[in-house]
């Protein structure tokens, strides 16, 4: 058996740092009835060596596709169809920067990544000795073999799928095109006024996670400072092709995905039969194999259990004996786009501080299976990666990120959250997370807490963060706001914390994406209303609350009461009948009789009404080429499936905001309804819905129906790269607006208890003969039936539930 020192030699020099030899040591892996691995070791290296080994047994093909996807190397394995994808990925990150960060880590932190990598490689060695039984069938089917892993590979899976996914959202180029289009259609004044409605910087009535009055917006007064030089006008020099960021060489995914997360955290006074309760539902989408991987880490300062996306080297959603933690996307804006003026005599130079300077550039070689290699030039300005390069137009666009250079530090802070024993130690790790992710806390004393992570820039006054700004040097960031200015709260007066990617706190600015905003209408109200409706919750009641919220149409509560009232005195019987059906609806989209249709006729009535109401409100005020973005209701496709979650769409939020303002006589700026009576418009939309449904399904309103949608576990990862065979796709019968996984931690009076459901299952392994792992889909029915399974933390509980045990030596 090779020693740890020998195993490290294969990756010794990629960081250029000598590694210290160690004596051979043991790792014990114990698996429970659902295949969850609990790793025991006395060294950090050993703990993560066991983790890497275990996940390689279960998820090797997914791991390999994740490695290739996040580094832009898919074409070398899957062929020429992925060349443009690889080019886009290569442009979006700097391998040299990541390696430099890794090289600076202390040895104990290097051991996390190196141990994990060598654990994977240990399993690769075992496959080499018995490929006929151990090689995952997907490799055989696709004609390539897994490669050995390094620390860099381990880090890049986290960086590429978490930081470069949730931390990198930006639609400033699209926003500019949207503004230009509205000005062209409605004139300068009205176009800008409409833009302010669609992409408002601040909506004071948007619900917040930090209760109003428990965080002071004034702490962010330093977010903008006077310019040191005269700022240039923010104008788009030339119209760009519509939605330039949708170009396949630039897009990481659709700019409007259905993901994100929800959570409830209950403190001592809001918990019944418990000291504190945390229930998280991270919504990454639904995939085969499961997006998250369950793990227990025990030893060398770790004693935690939970799960983590892609099997990151950490417990991202979990607990130890003292605290529990969770997270959701925070949506704070710490990414900006800069417009660069190219030198007309040399387009590889750009204007900065009055002089043309050369771009940093590197040549990337893209290997292509069965084809010639391709080369691409990747540019970088002082602001960051060049994401749009148009030499023929004399312009380029660069992206500056608040987290750049802190990717590895963020990974390590997330890893060490699981070692915290109290709120102070938890905050000490969260403050080092550079991306815009919300973090949540509860402990065995009944305390609860929340903090928005991320580094947020100090911008120059006049910098509209929704639009690209000049990259000539006038709008450079002036530093970063301290963590203390991020919204946070400890033991709020409400006794609970809840979030569904809503606004963190009053005064915190809206996101800059055209497809995501914080308004009065927010799906988090489905949680707030239920939490406020009961003085305290048992753990099972908290679970039921989250499950029930997952079936509610998040739009309905904001429109149905007013629509019903408006229809009360209609002289049309069909309108009154439809309104009566809506009045009796609890906003739930269920299929209790399992006939493949949602139970209430209110579902088709409301969905069709919302479609028509959006068209009547927004259809003729937005440019033809852009209006479609804002007319979607966001509902799941009847009879089809969705790999993600459901939110209130921006068009719907803006329409609702305008309805409130009009009713209160406070409408300002652009009049969305053009002076029309809003109630009359609502009734017109209802009549159009009645006409449409009558034509399609007959005149009996009570018989109108909508086919159910399903929860699809897609065989492609979030980047659209196949990570499983097409025949591996599966589904739960009814679509649910809930977490990809759900995890529940209960600090009971006699200790901590954990529960989770991670569908379809722990393993994605299929043997060469087609035999699937027994844990391939053994949590699919649990998820569909709204149930969960226990997780285990103590040595006694783990021993009692161990069905398989293995000891490794490294």
Question: Residues of each region from the PLM?
Answer:
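Second-shell loop/turn segments in exported
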Residues: 50, 97-111, 400, 412-417, ...
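Charged, long alpha-helical assembly modules
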Residues: 606-693
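Gram-negative bacterial Sec-dependent N-terminal signal peptides
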Residues: 2-23
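Stable alpha-helical elements in mature extracytoplasmic
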Residues: 94, 98, 109-119, 410, ...
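Hydrophobic alpha-helical segments
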Residues: 335, 395, 435-534, 588, ...
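Substrate-recognition/specificity elements adjacent to catalytic centers across diverse enzyme folds
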Residues: 25-288, 299, 308
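Glycine- and hydrophobic-rich flexible loops that cap the catalytic core of alpha/beta enzyme folds
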Residues: 299-309, 318-323, 327-471
């Amino acid at each position: 058996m090779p020693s740890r020192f020998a195993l490290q030699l294969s990756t010794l020099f990629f960081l250029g740092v000598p590694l210290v030899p160690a004596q051979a040591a043991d790792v014990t892996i114990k698996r429970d009835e659902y295949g969850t691995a609990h790793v025991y070791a006395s060294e950090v290296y050993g703990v993560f060596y066991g983790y890497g080994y275990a996940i390689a047994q279960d998820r090797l093909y997914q791991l390999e596709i994740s490695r290739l996807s996040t580094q832009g190397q898919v074409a070398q394995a899957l062929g020429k169809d992925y060349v443009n994808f690889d080019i886009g990925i290569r442009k979006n990150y700097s391998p040299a920067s990541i390696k430099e960060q890794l090289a600076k880590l202390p040895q104990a932190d290097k051991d996390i990544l190196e141990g994990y990598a060598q654990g994977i490689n240990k399993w690769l060695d075992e496959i080499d000795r018995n490929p006929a039984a151990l090689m995952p069938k997907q490799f055989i089917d696709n004609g390539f073999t897994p490669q050995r892993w390094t620390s860099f590979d381990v880090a890049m899976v986290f960086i590429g799928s978490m930081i470069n996914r949730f931390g990198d959202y930006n639609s400033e180029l699209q926003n500019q095109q949207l503004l230009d289009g509205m000005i062209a259609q409605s004139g300068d004044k009205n176009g800008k006024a409409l833009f302010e409605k669609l992409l408002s910087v601040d909506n004071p009535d948007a619900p917040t996670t930090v209760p109003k009055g428990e965080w002071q917006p004034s702490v962010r007064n330093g977010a903008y400072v006077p310019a040191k030089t005269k700022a240039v006008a923010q104008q788009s020099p030339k119209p760009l092709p519509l939605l330039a960021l949708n170009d396949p060489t630039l897009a990481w995914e659709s700019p409007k995905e259905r993901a994100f997360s929800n959570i409830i955290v209950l403190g001592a006074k809001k918990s019944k039969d418990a000291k504190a309760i945390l229930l998280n539902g991270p919504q990454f989408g639904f995939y085969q194999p499961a997006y998250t991987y369950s793990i227990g880490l025990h030893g060398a300062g770790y004693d935690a259990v939970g799960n983590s996306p892609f099997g990151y080297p950490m417990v991202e959603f979990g607990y130890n004996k003292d605290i529990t933690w969770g997270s959701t996307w925070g949506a704070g804006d710490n990414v900006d786009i800069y417009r660069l003026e190219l030198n007309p005599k040399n387009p590889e130079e750009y204007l900065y501080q009055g002089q043309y300077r050369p771009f940093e550039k590197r040549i990337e070689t893209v290997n292509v299976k069965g084809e010639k290699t391709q080369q691409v030039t990747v540019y970088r300005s002082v602001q960051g990666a060049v994401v749009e390069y148009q030499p023929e137009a004399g312009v380029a666009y660069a992206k500056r990120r608040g987290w750049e250079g802190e990717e590895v530090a963020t990974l390590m802070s997330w890893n060490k959250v699981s070692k915290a024993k109290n709120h102070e130690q938890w905050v000490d790790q969260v403050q080092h997370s550079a991306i815009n992710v919300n973090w949540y806390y509860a402990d065995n004393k009944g305390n609860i807490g929340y903090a928005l992570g991320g580094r947020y820039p100090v911008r120059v006054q006049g910098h509209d963060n929704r639009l690209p700004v000049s990259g000539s040097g006038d709008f450079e960031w002036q530093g970063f706001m301290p963590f203390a200015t991020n919204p946070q709260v400890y033991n709020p007066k409400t006794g609970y914390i809840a979030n569904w990617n809503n606004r963190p706190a009053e005064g915190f600015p809206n996101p800059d994406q055209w497809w995501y905003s914080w308004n009065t209408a927010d799906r988090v109200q489905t949680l707030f209303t239920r939490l406020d409706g009961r003085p305290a919750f048992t753990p099972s009641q908290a679970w039921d609350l989250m499950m029930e919220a997952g079936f509610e149409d998040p739009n309905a509560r904001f429109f149905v009461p007013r629509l019903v009232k408006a229809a009360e005195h209609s002289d049309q019987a069909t309108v009154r009948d439809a309104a009566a059906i809506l009045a009796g609806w609890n906003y739930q989209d269920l299929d209790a009789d399992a006939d493949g249709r949602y139970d209430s006729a209110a579902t088709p009535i409301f969905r069709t009404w919302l479609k028509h109401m959006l068209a009547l409100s927004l259809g003729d005020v937005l440019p033809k080429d852009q209006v479609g973005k804002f007319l979607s209701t966001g509902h799941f496709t009847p009879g089809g499936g969705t790999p993600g979650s459901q939110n209130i769409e921006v068009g719907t939020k803006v329409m609702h905001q305008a309805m409130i303002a009009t009713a209160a006589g406070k409408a300002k700026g652009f009049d969305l309804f053009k002076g029309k009576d809003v109630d009359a418009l609502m009734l017109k939309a209802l009549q159009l819905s009645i006409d449409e449904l009558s034509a399609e399904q007959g005149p009996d309103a009570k018989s109108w129906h909508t086919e159910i949608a399903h929860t699809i576990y897609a065989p492609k990862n979030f980047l659209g790269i196949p990570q499983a065979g097409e025949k591996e796709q599966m589904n739960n019968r009814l679509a649910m607006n809930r977490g990809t996984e759900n995890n529940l931690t209960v600090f009971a009076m006699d200790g901590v208890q954990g529960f989770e459901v991670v569908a379809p299952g722990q393993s994605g392994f299929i043997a060469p003969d087609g035999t699937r792992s027994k844990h391939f889909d053994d949590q699919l029915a649990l998820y569909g039936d709204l149930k969960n399974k226990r997780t285990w933390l103590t040595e006694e509980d783990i021993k009692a539930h161990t069905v398989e045990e293995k000891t490794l030596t490294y």
